[in-house]
């Protein structure tokens, strides 16, 4: 750094001192600036200042209306610094237009070039000047260590000759100390302090402008860093907006709100504390449903104590009613031990007679006897309380029964595969009962439960075992369903007993009649006598003069014919028609048995290529055109059959035999295989 006195940047302060002379301004010669020279008590320059002190080619007086911010920016050591912390030339603070400033050129320069040294010291002076700009006490701004001798540059007394507005004074004096008597450090320090002191001499009007403009700068508590030796401090995230978007002037309310916003502490969102029993809530979850159990307990306990039921020392929890009938209720229950669902049948027989009570107990005995079969509902636990008159049975839980399934599909065309599958499962269930010499005597769609896609027989309330020496059972009453009741169950076919009580004779054929009524409903959508009233049905069922109608086309319920031949019906095949007619024979001796129904062609349909050929003329060699194809009736072995098949395939490839003849030969081969002993 070259040894020189501090530069003079404020001509208004320069001319206010009467001690100013040409010798005192000799320090300007050290600048060695060819563009700057002294002439007629004024400074002339080919450049102009950005603070309004020099415009054009003449250095003019700075008006008292200039703001302290403008004079601060005009200082050569702060020229390249943005007061918001940005060192660019695009700062909005350089474009302050006041009445004392009128730009005459497109570019502006300072009188004194920016020194290359003491940069860090200038930063301290600038920071101090910005932070203490609004102070009204000049005495408090002077440091105590400053030399207060009259010859000192930093505290030289300024005397003003004339008044502002009357033109420039004729002469001004400024007393300077001898540069040789002061060290470089002292001169630099005093120069900075002098610039700092001069920047504070502003009018009251400019005080308000500077305070309003520079107050947001108080958010930055760290001094400006421009030296490469000192790293730049980190900014608070809230200061980024003000750093990149400096504002010169704004309303006082905006200033106050901005100050409150930056001074407000940052609130970090914390999830509210939740107790252990409080359920977790989320907007994406379904609506709240009252929990079935109390989660705070180790063992699930229902909300209502009356929902707990104990059967055979096993606890269950009621979930809802499945069905009801007469004096019985069926519930869906839950077992906490294995987390499975069951069905609970509760029967109240407090007002029932002994015959009814014995029938309920007989059902438990039959279920235990038939337990383990896949076609019979499983009984897990049961108990009878004669004191309370209550019977409880825990059984296998199903999805629905056959009655609901048929009602759901009654308006749709029948599906023969659907009928064939469930008809076979019903026959197998009844076969299990008959093999144990038991007659169910109350078969109906509601007594077949659908469990995991398979039908199972339930409700043995009126079932009774058959004696070993008889084929029928005798009951003193029958409480089955009328639409599925056999004719013999409605006819007094037995003599009076010694006690005068009429007996009803029932056997296995009565269950076959009931099965025939169920099959009829599966095909046509209703039972054979369901369209009649009860009195009419009771009279029509045993009456042989009343013919049961078997349509050849099965129509869905409530089918409407839009045009001729457009009904959505399904043709009933001859095998299905034969099964229904053979099951609904009024003479029970003519009805098919369960084993015969299981091997009926309806359940064992032959492929189309194995069905008997229609009687039509076929061109076969050695026969007339009106003759039927030759049927092979001789018994053959398996090897011979294999040779015939191979020969037939070979001939068919050469198109020597037609398809009808090959089918006929294959049918005869299969027929002969059936006749061969196993």
Curated annotation (Swiss-Prot):
Q: Which family does it belong to?
A: Belongs to the protein kinase superfamily. Ser/Thr protein kinase family.
The encoding gene is: mph1
The record places domain Protein kinase at: 316-607
Q: Which PROSITE patterns would you find in this protein's record? A: PROTEIN_KINASE_ATP, PROTEIN_KINASE_DOM, PROTEIN_KINASE_ST
Q: Which organism is it from?
A: Schizosaccharomyces pombe (strain 972 / ATCC 24843)
Please name the catalytic residues of this protein. 442
**Would you tell me the protein name for this molecule?**
Serine/threonine-protein kinase mph1
Taxonomy, superkingdom: Eukaryota
Query: What GO MF terms are annotated?
Result: ATP binding; protein serine kinase activity; protein serine/threonine kinase activity; protein serine/threonine/tyrosine kinase activity; protein tyrosine kinase activity
Q: Does Heme appear among the keywords?
A: no
UniProt key word ATP-binding: yes
EC code: 2.7.12.1
């Amino acid at each position: 750094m070259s040894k020189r006195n501090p530069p003079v940047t404020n001509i208004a302060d320069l001319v206010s001192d009467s001690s100013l002379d040409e010798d005192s301004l000799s320090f300007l010669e050290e600048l060695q600036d060819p563009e700057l020279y002294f002439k007629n008590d004024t400074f002339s320059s080919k450049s102009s200042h950005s603070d309004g002190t020099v415009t054009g080619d003449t250095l003019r007086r700075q008006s008292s209306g200039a703001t302290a911010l403008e004079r601060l920016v005009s200082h050569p050591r702060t020229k390249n610094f943005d007061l918001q912390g940005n060192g660019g030339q695009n700062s909005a603070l350089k474009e302050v237009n006041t009445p004392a400033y009128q730009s005459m050129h497109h570019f502006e320069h300072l009188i004194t070039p920016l020194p290359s040294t003491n940069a860090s010291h200038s930063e301290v002076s600038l920071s101090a000047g910005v932070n203490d700009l609004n102070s009204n006490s000049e005495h408090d701004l002077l440091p105590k260590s400053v030399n207060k001798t009259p010859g000192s540059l930093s505290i030289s007394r300024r005397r003003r000759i004339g008044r502002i507005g009357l033109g420039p004074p004729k002469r001004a004096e400024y007393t300077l100390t001898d540069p040789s008597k002061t060290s470089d450090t002292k001169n630099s320090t005093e120069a900075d302090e002098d610039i700092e002191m001069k920047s504070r001499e502003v009018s009251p009007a400019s005080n308000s402008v500077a305070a309003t403009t520079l107050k947001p700068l108080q958010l930055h508590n760290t001094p400006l860093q421009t030296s490469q030796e000192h790293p730049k401090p980190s900014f608070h995230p809230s200061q980024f907006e003000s750093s990149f978007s400096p504002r010169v002037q704004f309303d006082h309310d905006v200033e106050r709100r901005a100050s409150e916003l930056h001074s407000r502490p940052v609130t970090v969102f914390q999830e509210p504390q939740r107790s252990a029993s409080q359920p977790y809530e989320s907007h994406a979850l379904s609506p709240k449903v009252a929990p079935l159990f109390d989660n705070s307990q180790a063992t699930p306990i229902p909300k209502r104590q009356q929902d707990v039921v104990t059967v055979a020392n096993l606890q269950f929890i009621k979930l809802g009613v499945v069905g009801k009938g007469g004096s019985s209720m069926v519930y869906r229950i839950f077992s906490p031990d294995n987390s499975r669902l069951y069905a609970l049948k509760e029967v109240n027989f407090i007002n029932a007679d002994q015959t009814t009570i014995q029938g309920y107990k007989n059902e438990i005995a039959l279920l235990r006897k038939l337990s383990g079969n896949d076609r019979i509902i499983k009984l897990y636990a049961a108990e009878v309380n004669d004191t309370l008159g209550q019977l409880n049975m825990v059984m296998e839980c199903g999805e629905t029964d056959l009655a609901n399934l048929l009602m759901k599909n009654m308006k749709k065309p029948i599906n023969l595969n659907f009928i064939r599958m469930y008809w076979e499962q019903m026959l197998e269930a009844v076969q299990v009962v008959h093999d144990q010499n038991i007659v169910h005597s109350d078969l109906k769609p509601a007594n077949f439960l659908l469990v995991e896609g398979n039908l199972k027989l339930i409700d043995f309330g009126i079932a009774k075992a058959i004696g070993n020496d008889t084929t029928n059972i005798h009951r003193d009453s029958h409480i089955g369903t009328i639409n599925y009741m056999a004719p013999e169950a409605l006819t007094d076919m037995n003599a009076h007993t010694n006690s005068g009580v009429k007996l009803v004779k029932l056997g296995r054929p009565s269950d076959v009649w009931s099965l025939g009524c169920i099959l009829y409903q599966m095909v046509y959508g209703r039972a054979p006598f369901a369209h009649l009233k009860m009195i009419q049905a009771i009279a029509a069922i045993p009456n042989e003069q009343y013919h049961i109608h078997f349509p050849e086309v099965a129509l869905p319920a409530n089918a409407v014919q839009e045009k001729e031949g457009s009904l959505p019906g399904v043709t009933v095949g001859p095998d299905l028609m034969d099964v229904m007619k053979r099951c609904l024979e009024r003479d029970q001796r003519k009805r098919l048995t369960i084993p015969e129904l299981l091997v009926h062609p309806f359940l064992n349909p032959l492929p189309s290529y194995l069905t008997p050929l229609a009687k039509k003329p076929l061109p076969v060699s050695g026969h007339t055109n009106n003759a039927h194809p030759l049927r092979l009736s001789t018994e053959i072995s398996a090897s011979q059959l294999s040779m015939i098949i191979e020969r037939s395939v070979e001939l068919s490839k050469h198109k020597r035999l037609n398809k009808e003849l090959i089918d006929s030969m294959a049918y005869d081969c299969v027929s002969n295989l059936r006749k061969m002993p196993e």
